[in-house]
């Protein structure tokens, strides 16, 4: 069977060359006589893998020396608790609610202190990013929290909020490495890798060193303390070894393809193909305010739930898969992450044109 065009929101498409490399090394990783899946995480061979992965990520993102890179487990959702446990010194934090994942993080933080919702776009089904230029930031807030790209609703912060001097914490799961980033604008950014970097099971955090302290909330488990992982080079316990290995290959793939500047240009080109069609279509409509559109996740609808279902079924039969929208919103969603080739987006648009002609 030939490979499909996979528009899944995550786990998601990976670069074919990375999959081919991993397949070639599956039985014997570089003369070790074993797979990385079988390798001791304490071996020299694996230490080289994780060291190279960190070095390449630092190069890609321009991570300053005073920031730590942590490879952890538990996915982004575990960080909803870990962030307040580690950073909520005054037991106050401000959250900007632009979708389900920011809302879940905010709700989790309420278990540990005063979590204030200082802005929200819930009034219009999270179809836009609120004005964050002059927010009522709490005087004693430990941090301001955002989900930078909203996977479900297809919105993206084009400008970071004015945090009035407070540290910014960002969940970047679905826009990780999609464009250049100024790490110094964040106290911490983190993301699950299963959308834009690798297989499920790894979460990467980039966090400024002064935020990594022993002074965490009482009862914070050892495994949720950032200092545990920082002091042990992400090797306190057995890490998600194979997942990190694949992430490392994706980092090299990005470097070999011009880095994040080139990736951003390619992503803009891909997204324009789909958004231009949606803007001209008489059947399909995008659901997001134009200025806030994500380059990674593109939700759209026909306005008829039965027709939406018919489209998703027909697309699947044509080898264009995982277009069904998130269960909480319905409709369709095309996730066009770094590894989605522009040919896949063009094939999707061609299919949408055909479907529109047949279903007017």
What would you call each of these model-derived segments?
Residues 33-79, 86, 100, 108:
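Conserved N-terminal alpha-helix of the aminotransferase class I/II PLP-enzyme fold
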Residues 3-54:
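A glycine-/small-polar-enriched, mobile loop at the entrance of the PLP active site in fold-type I
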Residues 2-4, 317, 330-360:
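PLP-dependent enzyme catalytic core of the Aspartate aminotransferase-like
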Residues 77-144:
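PLP-dependent aminotransferase-like
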Residues 284-315:
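Conserved PLP-binding catalytic core of the aspartate aminotransferase-like
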Residues 169, 183-194, 203:
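Conserved active-site segment immediately N-terminal to the catalytic lysine
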Residues 15, 193-275, 289, 358-360:
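Active-site C-terminal subdomain of aminotransferase-like
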Residues 10, 109, 120-176:
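Active-site phosphate-binding strand-loop segment of PLP-dependent enzymes
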């Amino acid at each position: 069977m030939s490979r499909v065009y996979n528009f899944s929101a995550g786990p998601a498409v990976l670069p074919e060359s990375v999959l081919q490399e991993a397949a070639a090394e599956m039985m014997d990783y570089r003369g070790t006589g074993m797979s990385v899946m079988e390798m001791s995480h304490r071996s020299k061979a694996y230490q080289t893998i994780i060291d190279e992965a960190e070095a390449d990520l630092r190069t890609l993102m321009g991570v300053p020396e005073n920031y730590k890179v942590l490879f952890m487990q538990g996915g982004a959702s575990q960080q909803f608790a870990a962030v307040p446990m580690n950073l909520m010194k005054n037991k106050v934090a401000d959250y900007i609610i632009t979708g389900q994942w920011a809302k879940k993080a905010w709700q989790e933080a309420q278990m540990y202190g005063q979590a204030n919702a200082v802005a929200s776009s819930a009034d219009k089904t999270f179809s836009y990013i609120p004005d964050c230029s002059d927010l009522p930031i709490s005087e004693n807030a430990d941090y301001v929290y955002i989900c930078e790209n909203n996977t479900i609703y297809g919105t993206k912060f084009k400008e970071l909020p004015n945090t009035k001097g407070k540290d910014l914490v960002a969940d970047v799961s679905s826009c990780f490495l999609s464009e250049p980033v100024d790490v110094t604008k964040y106290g911490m950014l983190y993301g699950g890798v299963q959308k834009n970097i690798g297989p499920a099971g790894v979460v990467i955090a980039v966090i400024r060193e002064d935020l990594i302290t022993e002074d965490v909330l009482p009862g914070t488990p050892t495994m949720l303390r950032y200092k545990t992982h920082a002091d042990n080079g992400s090797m306190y316990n057995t890490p998600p070894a194979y997942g990190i290995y694949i992430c490392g290959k994706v980092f090299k793939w990005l470097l070999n393809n011009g880095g994040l500047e080139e990736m951003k240009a390619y992503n803009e080109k891909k997204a324009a193909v789909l958004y231009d069609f949606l803007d001209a279509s008489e059947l399909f409509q995008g659901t997001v305010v134009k200025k806030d559109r994500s380059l990674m996740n593109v939700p759209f609808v026909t306005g008829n739930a039965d027709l939406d279902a018919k489209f998703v079924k027909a697309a699947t039969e044509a080898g264009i898969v995982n277009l069904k929208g998130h269960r909480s919103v319905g409709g369709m969603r095309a996730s066009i992450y770094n590894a989605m080739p522009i040919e896949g987006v063009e094939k999707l648009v061609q299919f949408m044109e055909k479907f529109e002609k047949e279903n007017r």
